[in-house]
Amino acid sequence: MEKVLILLLVALAVAYAVPDPRGIIINLDEGELCLNSAQCTSKCCHREDGLSLARCAPKASENSECSAFTLYGIYYKCPCERGLTCNVDKTIVGSITNTNFGVCLDLGRATE
């Protein structure tokens, strides 16, 4: 039993010693398969349609199509980059079917 415990501790020490920021389950790069936006470094797990595999994608830039926050964690259109707002008419049906799409706008610049 002591040998198993020592082997386990050595394995954990080696695993923590490797300074690899890339993740297997979290901190996924763009293009890698994901199950939820929380896994991606960009915080956008995107799929083309209901039958495609979801992959990490960059957030939407200004004047690009976007989605408001979704409960599912997977987007058909990625949310906006930091500092931009997704100008969308939110509906209950759109929230359920994940079809609340809009356009990313910089509201600070739009009011000037």
Curated annotation (Swiss-Prot):
One annotated GO molecular function: lipase binding
One GO term describing the cellular component: extracellular region
SMART domains for the chain: COLIPASE
InterPro entries to which the protein is assigned, alphabetical: CLPS_chr (IPR047576), Colipase (IPR001981), Colipase_C (IPR017914), Colipase_CS (IPR017915), Colipase_N (IPR017913)
Primary subcellular site in the record, as a coarse category: secreted
Record's signal peptide: 1-17
CDD domains: CLPS
Quaternary structure (record): Forms a 1:1 stoichiometric complex with pancreatic lipase.
Family: Belongs to the colipase family.
Record function comment: Colipase is a cofactor of pancreatic lipase. It allows the lipase to anchor itself to the lipid-water interface. Without colipase the enzyme is washed off by bile salts, which have an inhibitory effect on the lipase. Enterostatin has a biological activity as a satiety signal.
This protein's name: Colipase
Organism: Bos taurus (Bovine)
Gene that encodes it: CLPS
